Amino acid sequence: MTRTLLQTYGLKFHPFRPDVPIEALYVTPTLDAFLRRVELSIADGGYVMITGDPGTGKSVALRLLKKRLDGLRDVVVGIIEHPQSRISDFYREVGDLFGVPLQAHNRFGGFKAIRARWTEHISTTCSRPVLVFDEAQEVINSVFCELRVLASKDLDSRQLLCVILAGDQRLPERLRSSELLPLGSRIRRRLVLEAASSDEMLACLEHLLETAGNSALMTEELKATLVDHAVGNHRILMNLCDELLSVAADRGLPKLDEKLYLDVYAATPKKAAKRR
């Protein structure tokens, strides 16, 4: 179905799905400036935090940041896949990411081995390894505390790691607690994502359509309507567009317009009312 849909509308890829190519991601000036600041701070290590409500663009920011870091010489990026792990599993995952064999039931041995690997990497490349936590609000306190000690050296005067934390608004709230304040106070770079303006939402949508290969897929009126109803949330905008494109393909429509929007979304409340 997806291949047929792409051929029907002359699209290189589905523009409204999360797995769009990296070049299709829209970069605002604020995001670009943040990415450059993080790039410049990699050599020194430390902590970076990206926060925002669901749908404001945290995953996009992480994808773009990883792409830029992957382009830097000798930078090794590891991504924590299970942020809810307890300390023992956290050590196992970090060991796997950085190629450090760990022995079970020997946390101190793992502590020393991982720090030795990071120290060796720094001495040979002059660059800190990078560890990324998505959904970082799910990380338990004991792992956060262990991470803070694991990543620092020489009485906290040196950082062995660049840590990138991304999460919703619960993350900064947790880092203000008395137990986690020592970690929260170490955050050097912050990006707070909020609801996007109408101009940013429209620019994002137009960039997606142009990059996908069909800038004329939607009428200008429909774009404006979608932006208004998405209330600054990129995920809502993509879901609205995805549904319209699927219905248009099913009906054999050559273009998406306001009439289609009204047919699809204005009918929903009426159906719900009839069921009641």
Model-derived features with residue positions:
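C-terminal alpha-helical "lid" subdomain
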Residues: 3-5, 160, 182, 199, ...
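Conserved NTP-binding/hydrolysis module of P-loop NTPases
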Residues: 11-18, 85-104
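Conserved Walker B catalytic segment
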Residues: 47, 116-119, 123-165, 178
